[in-house]
Curated annotation (Swiss-Prot):
Keyword Transmembrane in annotation: no
Keyword presence, Repeat: no
GO molecular function, one term: tryptophan synthase activity
CDD domains the record matches: Tryptophan_synthase_alpha (cd04724)
The protein, known as: Tryptophan synthase alpha chain
Gene behind the chain: trpA
Annotated Gene Ontology cellular component terms: cytosol
InterPro entries xref list: Aldolase_TIM, RibuloseP-bd_barrel, Trp_synthase_alpha_AS, Trp_synthase_suA
Biological classification of the source: Bacteria, Pseudomonadati, Pseudomonadota, Gammaproteobacteria, Pasteurellales
UniProt xrefs under PANTHER family: TRYPTOPHAN SYNTHASE ALPHA CHAIN, CHLOROPLASTIC, TRYPTOPHAN SYNTHASE, ALPHA CHAIN
Key words of the record: Amino-acid biosynthesis, Aromatic amino acid biosynthesis, Lyase, Tryptophan biosynthesis
Function: The alpha subunit is responsible for the aldol cleavage of indoleglycerol phosphate to indole and glyceraldehyde 3-phosphate.
Top-level class of the enzyme under EC nomenclature: lyase
Catalyzed reactions: (1S,2R)-1-C-(indol-3-yl)glycerol 3-phosphate + L-serine = D-glyceraldehyde 3-phosphate + L-tryptophan + H2O
Length: 269
């Protein structure tokens, strides 16, 4: 049983949902990023979703794009990102870790080379954001070869065929997108058909569902959990705290700690 399955079972027994923060690795630099990730875990994060710095993050809003640029400007590439994950895994042997990234970063190292490195540093799951389901088989095969769980996005406009495919292919968890468009904490309008999507995924025996995009407040976490998903992912709101406190390390960490505590508190069912 993988770390994600173990965590979801544990939370279920404790009558809690999962709170999963997203950050870009090495934002604003390697050492600060490690401190930030430690702060997230120490204050209640149930799992981590981590992004690799990339120069053209098409799926991200301006907040995450800025995080990518800060990390790249600090001289952090894929090599440093893997080193940072290894450091996190060494400190937190049981925290589920997933990666969210674009296919180009994987191709630069070959499929097997990338997933092998993921296994070496302790990654549990990988979500390749820009690979359509129809083209996903080589990724799935390579991931499974190294015991990495392939994760897929369920888009807000998913039809029955897509729901079935996502439920069958996605392991560890499913990333349910709250709404169409780019990520941003400002835009908090949920897709109207979320309830049907959740029902459809569960009908096909899906992995636990984590809902993301635009989740920035504790009340949203409560609402998300009421809809039947296993937890919430928050990215832009966290990265915004980092961005607003680039010159004040202590304030950055204390604000992140407070934010995660509030969001985690909202997962108590």
């Amino acid at each position: 049983m993988g770390y994600f399955e173990q965590k979801f079972l544990q939370l279920q027994k404790q009558k809690q949902g999962a709170f999963v923060p997203f950050v870009t690795l090495c934002d604003p630099n390697f050492d600060r990023s490690f401190e930030i990730i430690c702060t997230l875990v120490d204050n209640g994060a149930d799992a981590l979703e981590l992004g690799f710095p990339f120069s053209d993050p098409l799926l991200d809003g301006s907040v995450i794009q800025a995080a990518n640029h800060r990390a790249l400007n600090a001289g952090c590439s894929t090599k440093e990102s893997f080193q940072l994950i290894a450091k996190v895994r060494s400190k937190y042997p049981d925290i589920p870790i997933s990666l969210l990234l674009c296919a180009n970063l994987i191709y630069a190292q070959t499929l097997d080379g990338f997933y092998q490195r993921c296994a070496e540093v302790g990654v549990d799951a990988v979500l390749v954001a820009d690979i359509p389901l129809l083209a996903s088989e080589p990724y799935i095969q390579s991931a499974q070869k190294y015991d990495i769980q392939p994760v897929f996005i369920c888009p807000p406009n998913a039809d029955e065929t897509t729901l079935k495919a996502v439920a069958e292919k996605s392991k560890g968890y499913i990333y349910l997108v709250s709404r169409a468009g780019v990520t941003s904490a400002e835009n908090q309008q949920s897709a109207k058909n979320l309830a049907n999507l959740i029902k459809g995924l569960k009908k096909y025996g899906s992995a636990p569902i984590l809902q993301g995009f635009g989740i920035a407040q504790p009340q949203q976490v409560k609402d998300v959990l009421k809809s039947g998903v296993a937890g919430a992912i928050s990215g832009s709101a966290i990265v915004q705290i980092i961005e607003q406190n680039l010159t004040d390390r202590e304030k950055c960490l204390s604000e992140l700690a407070e934010f995660v505590q509030k969001m985690k508190q909202a997962t108590l069912l």
